[in-house]
Amino acid sequence: MIPDISLFSLKKNWDAAVAGLIGALLIYFFTRHGGIGLEPDSIVYLSTARSVAHGSGFFEFEGIPMTDFPVGYPLFLSIIIFISRVDIVQSGHIVNMFLYFSLIYLCGGIINHISTRTKWVKIPFLILIVFSPALLTLYTYLLSETLFLLMTLLFFVALHQYGQKKTILTLVVVALIAGLSCIVRYAGVTLVGAAGLMILLDKKLVLKKKIGHLLLFGTIGIAFLVANLVRNSLITGMLTGDREKSLTSFFENIQKYAYVFGDFFYFHDLPLAFVILIGVSFFVFYIYSHIIHFYKSNRYYNYWNICGTYFVVYTIFIVLSATFSRFEGLNMRLLSPLYLSCLLPLTFVTPWVISKLNGWKRYGLISVFVILFVVINYYQYKDNRVFYQAATEAGLPGYAEDSWRNSPILNYIKSDKKRFKEGTRIYSDGNEAVYLFTGLQADLVPHVESKGDYENFKEEQQNDYYLVWFYDCADPEYVSLVKLLKENYYVELASAPEGRLYFHPSSKVNQTK
C-alpha cells in the first residue's frame, strides 16, 4: 500500500508542480508592470509590517495600533522584510508566487488522495484552479487571504493525518495550524470549529479520549486568538476594532452568497431563483455528505468529508457575520475559502457519478461534464484576459495603477515635504495613498455617522492643517468636499484632474470662502 504522505511527493505529484509553476508565472506576468496589487487593506498590512520590522510594534499608517485585523499576516510580512532587507512592495509578487505555487501543489496532493482510482480527473481540475480568476485576483494582491488559503489546505492535510493516527502529536499540529490561522484572519476560528466538530462526532474515538482531545485542541486552538483579542482590548478597549451593525438582512446575504458562487462557476446569468437554488444546494450537499460519512466511520477523516465540513462551518460563520456585523459585502475575496473546499471533493464526485452509469447515459453525462469544463474555462479565459490587459496597460486596479504613481497632487507633495510643517496634521479621503506615495501620515476625514469624529474635526479648525482630496476616493459614508469647503476656510495649494490640495490656516477659523 502506498504510504499516505507519499501522494504529496514530487514523484506522485509532478503534474501539480508543473501547474504550480504555471500559476507562479501567471502571478509574475500580472504584476510585472506595476508590481504587487495594493488595496486599502493592503496598506494597513504593509504599514504594520514595516512598523514591526523596524521594532516599533503593531502600528498602522495612521499611527494607531492595528486592531481591525489580527497580527499574523503583518507579522509574516515583517519577517520577510527583516530577512530579505527588501520592502514588501518590491518583493510582494515573489512572496505570492511562492504561496500560489504551494497552494496548487497541495491541491494536487489532496486530489491524489480523493481520486485515487481515476487519475484522469486531476489535470482538468488543476487547470480550473490555476486559471481561476477568484484565486488570481487574490494572489496578485497583498492580502491576508493569500496566506490564509494556504494554511487552510495545510489544516486539511494535518486533520487527515490526525484521523489516521489519533495521536497527541498529530492533534497538536492540527491545533497549531488552526490557532495560527486565527491570527491571520479572524475567520480562522472556522478551522477551530470544523476540527472541533469532527472530533466531537468521531464515533471511533472513545469518550474519555475524545474529551481529552477536545480540551487539548480547544486550548491550543483558541490561545493565539484570545491573546490577540486581549491585546486589542487592553490597547483600545475593543476586541476587533470598531465594528458597526450590519445593514443587510440574512436573506440578502444568502442571495449575495449564491451570486458569488455564480461568479465562481459562471452560472450568475441564470434567473435569480436558480442562482440561489444552486448556491444553497452546495451547502445542503455537504451537510448530507457529512451525515453519510458519520455512518461510514472508516472514511470519516477522508479529504472529501474534511473539505465538506469546513465548507458548512465557514458558510454559516460568514453569512451570520455579514448579518450581524457591518463590513464589505459578501464577495469573492470573503468567500474565497469556500472555493477550494467546494471544488476539491468534486474530483471524487464527478468520476463516481460517471461510473454508476452505463452505455449512452454514461457518454451523455461525460459530454455534459466536458461542456461544463470547456464553458467555465472559456469564461475564465475572458475574465483573465480583461484583468491582464488592465494590469499590463496601467497596473493592477488600486494603488498599483500608473495614475496613482504619476499623480500630480502626490508628486507635488513629494517634491517638497518640508512645506508640511512638523506637527501639522493632514486630513484626506485617501489617507492610504498619502502614506504609500509620500510617507506622510494622514488622518481620514470624518465619518458622516460618527458625531464624535466630526466634533473632533471641528475642534481641529482651531489649528493649521492640510486637506488632500482625491475625487476617486470620495465615499458617501464620509464627509464630502462640498461640505468641507462650505463650512471651513481653505487656501488651495495645488489642483489636478484627480484631486486638490488645501491648507487650512488657524487664523481664518471664523471665515468662509
Question: What is each of the regions a protein language model found here?
Answer:
Residues 112-117, 155-171, 181, 205:
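Membrane-interface transmembrane helices that cradle and orient dolichyl/undecaprenyl
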